[in-house]
Amino acid sequence: MSFASETKKELTHMDVSDSDAKVELAAFIRMNGAISFSNQLVIMDVQTENAAIARRMYQLLKDLYEVPIELLVRRKMKLKKNNVYIVRLKSGTRGILEDLRILEPPMTFTKSIDRGFVKKRSAKRAYLRGAFLASGSVNNPETSSYHLEIFSVYEEHNEAICALMNQFDLNARTLERKNGFITYLKEAEKITEFLSIIGATSALLHFEDVRIMRDMRNSVNRLVNCETANLNKTINAAVRQIDNIKYIQSTVGLEALPERLREIAALRIANEDVTLKELGEMLTTGQVSKSGINHRLRKLDQIAERLRSGETPSQVGLKVSNS
């Protein structure tokens, strides 16, 4: 079962007050309900491929309204042959839809969210929970980028969902898709806050555990990459230094160097693998700091480059014996 399915399954076990149950139903029916007319009856079908969600919608309707309710199961014949669960109302439909603020007399459907219906904070949470159960999804934090979204056919309703989410400072954004619109979250912290808002505590804890482990792994990888880069930089510098010292040795000889450069040059080519700190501790003339050693090696680099460019030893400041 996917992380999104596990999250929705958890939500279907939540106990809610009658007022919050109505708000949750309103969100779900507005997004997943369909109306048809037969023999002067207004028939409403609420459809989902999730059995646990179908049972919840059936139970909420049964607890709130004293009307006959059917629960049907059909099998999809295209693509994935999943079961489709249909909660069907054949009587009292108009009154229920008006009570849920989905329908206004005489027969006008509302595409947005009734502000008075979600005035309380618990009602806002309930509406977002119903919307997520209806058409929400959240990526598995273990295997992909952080992403949570809720799909809506109508732009007006999508904007209302986004505004509702942002009343909780979630930094939600909207985007148009091929067949509708989505409100989405990309920040891991905001996704955990949303899971808390809708009541998915277990999913939240799992998400946080995975996020912490991912952040730790990323930190370790960054540290290793940084250390590897620094090591490569050190190795490349040592190779360059030794190459330059050997060039000086083969052209004018190390004897032409000033004493403080001559000693470090000899130590460097004799101890290719040691650090600058260790080189500083090897000097017979007294220990020199790492920065001091680095300064002398840079001077040797400059001398080698000037000799390579055609300057004479005297121009570089070296004294070459004529004997």
From Swiss-Prot:
Keywords, alphabetical: Cell cycle, Cell division, DNA-binding
Gene Ontology biological process terms in this record: cell division; regulation of sporulation
DNA-binding region: 275-309
Domain of life: Bacteria
MF (Gene Ontology): DNA binding
UniProt family annotation: Belongs to the WhiA family.
Role this protein plays: Involved in cell division and chromosome segregation.
Protein name (database record): Probable cell division protein WhiA
Source organism of this protein record: Listeria welshimeri serovar 6b (strain ATCC 35897 / DSM 20650 / CCUG 15529 / CIP 8149 / NCTC 11857 / SLCC 5334 / V8)
Gene that produces this protein: whiA
